[in-house]
Amino acid sequence: SPRSIVGVDASVKRLGNYRILREVGRGGMGVVYEALQETLDRRVALKVLPPHAMLDAQFVSRFRIEAQAAARLQHPNIVPVIGLGEDRGIHYYTMRFIEGEGLDRLLDRTRAFLDGDSVPGNGAVTSPLLATELPDRLPGSGVSSGSEPSVVSGVSDAPERAARVDRKTYFRNVARIGLQAADALAYAHAQGVLHRDVKPSNLILDDGGRIWIADFGLCRDETAEGLTQAGDLVGTLHYLAPECFRGVHDVRSDVYGLGLTLYELLTARPARDGSTRAALARQIAEESPPRIRSQTADVPRDLATIVEKATATNPMRRYATADSMAKDLRAFLEGRPISARTPSLGYLLAASVRRHKALAATLITALLAVILLTVLYVHDVK
């Protein structure tokens, strides 16, 4: 049955022309519902301010500014903001409702996959991440805004599929996810918008293999003044970059959150294991995550290098932009050298062989033939 708005009179089951269907998620900046936009007969994700915030004029102002900032983002990998309103003192905005699954929900199956090279038959829908090879490029791929998978995504109704990917394909799928997300973040950053809470639950993978960045409701519009205090800690602690504890947050902090998300997909383990907030904060500020290949030995070296560069404790050692991270992920997928590794002759030759496998095989065959003919010739001469 439809649910009322939390903290508001129980009779409130609609806002404007939206009928509330169910709560699907909540975070520090609001509660998200699945709702029906009755005028257009379509489902949307509707995000409202938490009750305690509706009396705070500054909070409301920030909420509206952030919704407007997110609405400016028009990219195929960002959940679009499609409406902003207020009804009976309740402030809300609406987003496209994405059918898919948050990466946080995939981590348990990812762990089973990496540990046993299979997905347990638990009746859950198998994600494209584990069931098929994702395309390197999607039609109209770009960037877009959104919210937690639990916030704007529904459980896919696609039929259950057995996992068919091998480990090599899985690792490439992780790189493809990272590339889509990095492209999207680069677009948002170019518009002056930071996400500030990049994490697995804010990345939704739909049935077509497209990743959607969700919950720009914690974003900071770089063109807005005075709405976020310099020392505010906005975001989920586990995925906060070390500099955020000093009140510093820039594009490299979003790169860090994406890097940690990819780290977990590659290792099926959290980057840090602090049991308390204080211990976790200390680890984030002082310690680098364990090396990826010490956790999952067969992760391709270049992919591990990219993710480790993105998650460097010192922001000066990270990718300076999401675009530079995207370029390295694209280079990895295309078999080209990545900028994060020192280009030794052996590395460049190996990359060239990976990229031109057919030509390399032909040349090696020809070389072996020449060697064989030379040996036979010398033998005949003797």
Regions found by a protein language model. Name each.
Residues 36-44:
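Conserved N-lobe loop of protein kinases adjacent to the ATP-binding glycine-rich P-loop
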